[in-house]
Amino acid sequence: MDEPRPEAANVDSQQNSQCCLTRSEVYALVREVINKRKHHNLVTNVCDHVFDDGFEEQLKYIRANIDKALITVGGEHKHCKRLAAHIKKINKIFKLNKSLETEYKQSIDRYGSNRFNRNN
């Protein structure tokens, strides 16, 4: 029987790792965006919190540059993960509800009111 080639295993693990984006990778992306914008003196709203309206500047920068965005992942066998495939997830992560009332209304719209009515 032929010995498995380590290169093939490494390629497979690289392909499989492209399909998920971790929270720490999203945090790393935001940190790098802020650092890059500061480096180029694009400091408008760079200190705004994710709940502030000014944070949209970071998201605009991410969307404009997502095709060039890479995250280096892995321990012993490091490789780069492209982030362009994850733009929908990134947009969803940062589309945050700022009030419980809004979140409740969106949950009702999504799942229906019967699910939240305990009297039934």
UniProtKB/Swiss-Prot annotation:
GO biological process: regulation of DNA-templated transcription; viral life cycle
Pfam families: Baculo_LEF-11
Recorded family membership: Belongs to the baculoviridae LEF-11 family.
Source superkingdom: Viruses
Protein name per the record: Late expression factor 11
InterPro entries per record: Baculo_LEF-11
Keyword Transcription: yes
DNA damage found in the keyword field: no
Keywords: Transcription, Transcription regulation
Protein role: Involved in late/very late gene activation.
Residue ranges of coiled coil: none
Gene name for this UniProt entry: LEF-11
